[in-house]
Amino acid sequence: MLPELGTFLLVLALLVALVQAVVPLAGAQRGRSSWMAVARPAALVQLALIAAAFAVLTHAFLVQDFSVRYVAENSNSLLPVMYRYSAVWGAHEGSLLLWTLVLALWTGAVAIWSRQLPAHVIARVLGVMAVVSIGFLAFLLFTSNPFARLFPVPLEGGDLNPLLQDPGLIIHPPMLYCGYVGFAVPFAFAIAALLEGRMDARWLRWTRPWTNIAWSMLTVGIALGSWWAYYELGWGGWWFWDPVENASFMPWLVGTALLHSQAVTEKRGSFASWTLLLAIAAFALSLLGTFLVRSGVLTSVHSFAADPARGLFILVFLLAVVGGSLLLYALRAPRLSLGDDPRRAFAGSSRETLLLLNNLLLTCACAMVLLGTLYPLLADALGLGKLSVGPPYFGTLFVVLMAPLVALLPFGPLTRWQREQASRPLALLAPWAALALAAGVLAWFAAPQGHWKAALGVAGAAWVLLGTVRFLWTRRAAKGRKFTAEMLGMVLAHLGVAVFLSGALLVEALSLQREVALAPGQQVQIGRYALHFDTVEELRGPNYVSDRANLQVFKDDAPVGVLHAEKRRYASGGQTLTEAAIRPGPFGDLYVALGEPLGNQAWAVRVHLKPFVRWIWLGALLMALGGLVTAADRRFRRSPEIQDG
């Protein structure tokens, strides 16, 4: 009876969400405080119901209840217990339930930590979030019920996709969803402000830490996905411009613009329309990512099985939410009351102008990724044939758009609000620009064949790093040791950009790769490393059989270790999977992947040397840490002193 209980809990959650959406919004419109007061307890009850339903599904996986169709399709008696947990969200129905749970968690958190906001504001915010919950709960119950029964009950289940049987995939989807769904908070605030007809900059102070936390979680989620693809797929790459990778990257780009736009609106009263539109766009792109993953319209290693009914449901929901939000924005934004604030005017040479350029470049980059992702689909629909858009398009245009952004980045913190003499930040940064340029020239000559990406990566990273150092020096000279958490968070995030930039471009410029046939006793040379192919042995895991190659590693003729690369064959389904062997290091990885057997005891072996690849993920973690440090600023924890009404 537990599966039926799970369905019943979701039905109750849908009913509570309907109450949470209708009653508080109507109360805010009519000024009924008792109706508005329903929002908080309804949000917490909805969270409890969805969490209980999620616990029921988790229990079904742990006890291997194959009478539940979703469990029977994605688990079996050989699946290790650790992966039974990740199997809960390993396919369509469970991942959608996880999304709904994460949305309920964000809604509950807003209900608990928003006591300082006026009742009519929080009623509208929680009401809007409930509308989104209604859509996902209805989607679950009518097209994707994870508790649907299967009769007759099979004696054995299917299997979780072997690609997902990995510790990284236990963390990656929940973290990614926390980022995706977290943008529902600024989205709900934007819709609430449009419904209200005015936006107090002090309200915006309340939303900024929520946006920073969501953006940080999305950053970590994307980085975890990149790390997983690097070591699990056996290609040695860290980003493939896969459609679903792009689907998570687009809200990150718009979310980055939103972070900066919110700061301007809160501090200076400018960019209000930008901030509202970016808040809508960030969440709309998160919903678009959901559509791409679950509709089957795009091919991806991340996609779930195609289902036209599900795809149509999500598309209608997406159009309703996004179309309704943009219509409301078009009708209300031009008349939005912001009050009189002399700080809103700014000159062409000012920090506001630089941040406006930041917004434009990031949104253009997002539009470029969106076009490249959807163009093959549109071309096919219009009868133009099957087309593909690959890394050459994304890589070239992205560098063109990101280069000016990196060039402008150090100027922002050193430029004054409202009006600035252009010569001042130029004079402050000129010596540092010369040093960065010199570093790039040195990298050009040091790299094999003078690779331009090595020069660009070193020069760009040095420019951002030295510009950040110059800002800290200037700030300390002017203010002593006074640094707010918001400022330290900005510094960490900008340093993360420098580290990421150097890692991403250097690994592309300096990587080495060899594909060879090796038999026991043979060796291959790559860079300063020699790998001696010793033996291949057969091993048995809990639900797979593995051919494991043992390779002795020598660096400059000195032994430094042994690598074990595997080829696994899973018992259920017979799928074969490559498990790469990696010798990590702060300045580069030695990466070995075992290919197919070639006969006469020989195997195809791919060997990569990946300089500075780990700097990519270190940079992403620094950016995420910067967002969390900013969210912890004491200023955001003080009451915004907003008067009700």
Where are these regions (language model features)?
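Contiguous transmembrane helix-bundle modules in multi-pass membrane proteins
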Residues: 1-33, 50-52, 66, 243-251, ...
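Extended, hydrophobic alpha-helical segments in both membrane/secreted and soluble proteins
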Residues: 174, 181-191, 203-261, 274, ...
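Transmembrane-helix bundle segments that line or gate the permeation/cavity pathway
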Residues: 50-73, 77-79, 86-111, 139-149, ...
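Membrane-interfacial loop-to-helix junctions in multi-pass inner-membrane proteins
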Residues: 29-50, 112-133, 195-216, 240-241, ...
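Hydrophobic alpha-helical membrane-insertion segments
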Residues: 45-61, 129-141, 278-286, 358-370, ...
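Soluble non-transmembrane domains of integral membrane proteins
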Residues: 516-606
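Membrane-interface interhelical loops and short amphipathic "cap" helices
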Residues: 1-9, 31-37, 59-93, 145-173, ...
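A conserved hydrophobic secondary-structure block that centers on an alpha-helix together
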Residues: 11-28, 32, 95-226
